[in-house]
Every structure is written in structure tokens, then in C-alpha cells.
Amino acid sequence: VGNRWEAWLHLVRRLMDVQLSQQPDQLYWKLTKNGVFSVKSMYLDVINSSVVPSSIHVWRVKVPLRIKVFMWFVHKQVILTKDNLAKRNWMGSSRCSFCDHNENIKHLFLDCPLAKILWRSIHIAFNINQPTSINMLFGTWLDGVDSDTARHIRVGVCALLWAVWNCRNDLVFNRSTNIHFLQVIFRATAFIRMWSLLTPTEARERLVTASTRWEMV
């Protein structure tokens, strides 16, 4: 009882110091001067802090900011896959759009039969084993790979996951009937070629060559 009373008195003292404003409340984003949220301000805050150390490479890879944010959401496992929608009381089917299993982030990007074929094609093209978990994908997966190669691979992984997500959404929202794994690869390599414009000329050529090699598997 004594501790509760002390806690209550402490709370009362804290509340007495609060000055209530007569103005209506409003949302204010503290990372911008005008108080309005922007992705850029969030991005700069993240890369200059240690909030997500295991996914720091995502913020440094040469892809559009939108893709970096998407990859960060994948890492945090908060993109709106059907299991996450169900947590928001969504009542739709929980089945994966590519197969008959329940959809979650790990299944969609790693365990789905379609995903396994895609990762197998990467293994054949570049002799890199598939990560076994989302944490591994953003953590130790590329340990031991030289930095230049790892940098290019990360661009490819961004393209792969973004292509899978786009194809999944085509099935869900655009009523596409089916998706062949080659469609996903071609879409991913198209993203790589487009994003290669963000890199210096020499690195751009290596990215384009790698994407062509992937298509030929």
C-alpha cells in the first residue's frame, strides 16, 4: 500500500506541473521544421541512429527510397501480408496467393514454392545459398562475401522481394489468374536495370551483367 501511495503522490505532483493549452491539439512531427511528416526525415533519422542495426545495409543500398522503406518494413515484419491484416480484424482468406498455405512474411518471401524456385535460381546463377529466416536475410546471410559483390546482391534482393510483392498484389487486387516464376525474375531484373542508373557507370555495367546472367538460368 505504501508504495502505491508514494506512486500516486508522485503522479499527482507530475500532473500539477502540466500546463494545459486552450488551443486544440494537433499532430507535430518533430523531425521537420514545419512539423509535417516526410519519409526523407524518417530515413535520415534512421540511418544516423542505431535503431535498426541489423538492417543498416538496406538504407545504404542504391535503390529508390520507397524500396528502402519497403525492405525496412519487411525486416520489421509489418508489411500487410494476410496474417498482419488478420491482426487488424480483416476477415478475408489467409491463403497465400501463390499456393495453398497461410500467408505470412517468411512464407511469402522464403518458404512459398514460388519463392524457393526464385532463390534456387539465384543459387544457380551466383552460388549463394538461400537465407533461412528474415533475420538472417538482413543479418549474417552475406557474411564472408566481399563488399562489392554483397552490395550488388543486396540490390538484387531488393528487386526480388519487390517483384514478389508486386506480383502478389497483381493476384490480389488486379485479378491476375496466375504468375509464372519467370515473370517474377523478368520483373526483378527490369527493376535492377532501372535502379542501376543510381550507381556509377562501372558498377552499373556489373549490375546489368548480373541481371542478364540471372535471366539466363
Where are the regions that the model predicts?
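A helix-boundary/hinge signal
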Residues: 1-217
